[in-house]
Amino acid sequence: MLTAEDKKLIQQAWEKASSHQEDFGAEALLRMFTAYPQTKTYFPHFDLSPGSDQIRGHGKKVLAALGNAVKNIDDLSQAMAELSNLHAFNLRVDPVNFKLLSQCIQVVLAAHMGKDYSPEVHAAFDKFLSAVAAVLAGKYR
């Protein structure tokens, strides 16, 4: 469960990161494809090379969805309902992949935010991304 302090830290960090959605999202996806090559199977129609328009576009979508989750942090289930349905029923993404992408997002945020991504912010974001992943995986039950 996210505390009031966690929510504050997440919102402050997101405010700094949100202007870089396309870059950070693309970098997180590329990290995931490199570290976990099995995740590429969900993107057979994508040009998976660094800087491709498809990677940048999807990265921006992923981080925009995360921004929506930050904005609706007190009602993640409602905010993520459409994405949960899409990933569970249409795309049939294995829920473990949400955790893999979450790890890559953490690395990107830490790499670019430096001191602003303190251990406290990291811990809060870890809880937040776990909550988002749990909501996205909720339709699989």
UniProtKB/Swiss-Prot annotation:
Heme b binds at residues 58, 87. GO terms for molecular function: haptoglobin binding; heme binding; iron ion binding; organic acid binding; oxygen binding; oxygen carrier activity; peroxidase activity. It comes from the Eukaryota. One of its GO terms (cellular component) is hemoglobin complex. Keywords: Heme, Iron, Metal-binding, Oxygen transport, Transport. Belongs to the globin family. Involved in oxygen transport from the lung to the various peripheral tissues. This is Hemoglobin subunit alpha-D. It comes from Coturnix japonica (Japanese quail).
